[in-house]
Amino acid sequence: MSERSYYDILGVSKSANDEEIKSAYRKLAIKYHPDKNKGNKESEEKFKEATEAYEILRDPKKRQAYDQFGKAGVGAGAGGFGQGAYTDFSDIFGDFGDIFGDFFGGGRGGFGGGRRSGSQRGSDLRYNLEVSLEDAALGREYKIEIPRLESCGDCNGSGAAKGSSPTTCPDCGGSGQIRRTQGFFSVATTCPTCRGKGTTISNPCKTCGGQGLQEKRRTINIKIPPGVETGSRLKVSGEGEAGPNGGSHGDLYVVTHIKRHELFERQGNDLILVRKITLAQAILGAEIEVPTIDGKKAKMKIPEGTESGQVFRLKGHGMPYLGAYGKGDQHVVVKIEIPKKITRRQRELIEAFARESGENIPGSKGKIFTK
């Protein structure tokens, strides 16, 4: 069964406007919200599915990327596909105050609203890496540079100046949330005093401004395994952003995008190559050499009477299977090259060949021959 599109999940058409998308999501969110369907795993999954779809389709850039590349080209906060683009995979439920505020009276819903105090895991990052077809076939190590949030060295991530420390928020008691009940809904809203941290800082660190985090650039070596294709996602554990309050780093996801090749066309794990041959080679047969993706040459026999467009297979000369043994094949499409100019002697021989074949070729007045 094919994977449902984000439009199908929300029940809207591809031409739906922002209000239609928001309205469709609002209905699904109310219907499947976990606080309304406690213990119902199916409802929880449908809520997550609808939220993921809305997170992509509400953002014009993400929606455009999704329409063009599908799910392979988008992630939470995706910002395009140029070399080195990276994305923050923050908790997608954190951005929907405008939706839940309409029917919960403001703030976040109870789903995903756990305790906020203490250290938290950092956000994941996405990095789009352009890879040549040769590197995708052979594998290669790339050196990339990413901007990311790291723990402040002066305050060790606490956000408080030296000699001081954060104190428990008096309004939420350190939970980071204010919870209230409306009918069968139990709604947890972010504490406005500590903004969900559970602590307050009276004397903030001057280096990081009390955030506990600083943006820095980090260079990382990435090993691209043989066989990757456009949309392949490589996980680099612990290379995402540092978490608040000294929390652990998230992960880095490197998404590969294979560049177009001037000779080869990739179809799955097979490669297609167009190779020109002469008229004589097509008629008489020959043994020719063809380039392969590993930079070498492979010998291939052209049988007598080969026609233009005929396809020959070089077994095992295609792309490697990612994470497995074996390779695809290379398919060579031959094209007979007709000379634009011929010598007088060549013309005489071709005319003699035509007469021998019973063809009546009148003398041409054109100048397609050279001396």
Curated annotation (Swiss-Prot):
Matching InterPro entries: DnaJ, DnaJ_C, DnaJ_domain, DnaJ_domain_CS, HSP40/DnaJ_pept-bd, HSP_DnaJ_Cys-rich_dom, HSP_DnaJ_Cys-rich_dom_sf, J_dom_sf
GO annotation, biological process: chaperone cofactor-dependent protein refolding; DNA replication; protein refolding; response to heat
Keywords linked to the UniProt accession: Chaperone, Cytoplasm, DNA replication, Metal-binding, Repeat, Stress response, Zinc, Zinc-finger
Pfam families found in the cross-reference section: DnaJ (PF00226), DnaJ_C (PF01556), DnaJ_CXXCXGXG (PF00684)
Gene3D superfamilies in the record: DnaJ domain, Heat shock protein DnaJ, cysteine-rich domain, Urease metallochaperone UreE, N-terminal domain
Binding positions for Zn(2+) 1 per the UniProt entry: C152, C155, C205, C208
SUPFAM superfamilies hit by this protein: Chaperone J-domain, DnaJ/Hsp40 cysteine-rich domain, HSP40/DnaJ peptide-binding domain
Family: Belongs to the DnaJ family.
Name listed for the protein in its UniProt record: Chaperone protein DnaJ
Taxonomic lineage from the root: Bacteria, Pseudomonadati, Spirochaetota, Spirochaetia, Leptospirales
